[in-house]
Amino acid sequence: LKSFDGGLSFSDTIRVSENNPSHKYRMGNIKIDYNGNPIVNYMQYLLNWTEPKQMVNRSINFGDSFLGGIEASQSAPGEPCDCCKASLVLDNDDIFLLFRNNNSNERNSYVSKSVDGGLTFNLVNDIDDYDWMVNGCPATGPLGVVYSDSLLIVRRSGATGNDEIVYNKINKVDLNYSYTRNIDP
C-alpha cells in the first residue's frame, strides 16, 4: 500500500516478493531512499520453512513495481537465523543489511553491504567478538544507523554466558569494527 496524500487514501496492495507458490515470505522491513523509493527486506523460505534467505527488493518508481529480490545473505556461512528479524540501513546508494546468522547453531550478527543500490551484496562481515552457540532462536536481530564514516549497531548476545546488549562501531567502507562495548552492565 502507498499514499501520496498524507494517508487520506491508499493504493491497492503491491506485491514485493515473487509470486512463487513454492516459497513462503515473512518478517518484512522497509526503508525509503533519498529519492523516495521503497527498499524492502524480507525472509524467503521453502514451504517446509527450510532454506531461509534474507532478500532485498527495491523499487525505482515509488513502489509501483519492484526490480526483483536479491539474496543479501548468500556470502555469509551457514544460513540466516530463520526466526530473527533483520534490519536495513541506507547511506545514499549503499544498502546495509544487518541480520543474525545460523552457522551450525553459532548465532552471530552479520552485516552485508551493497554499493550498487541493492543489485548485489558482495561484502559481508561477522560483527561478533565471541561466537554465540545456542541451539534455539534468540528471536532478535541487530539495529543500526549511519554516523559519519561508520555504522553504529546495537544487538543482543549471549556468547559470554550472560544475556547482554552490545554496541559496535563499524567502518562503513570495509565493514570492519573498531570497537565493541557491552552497554548492559
Where on the chain are the PLM-derived regions?
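Extracellular, repeat-based ectodomains that mediate carbohydrate processing or recognition
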Residues: 1-185
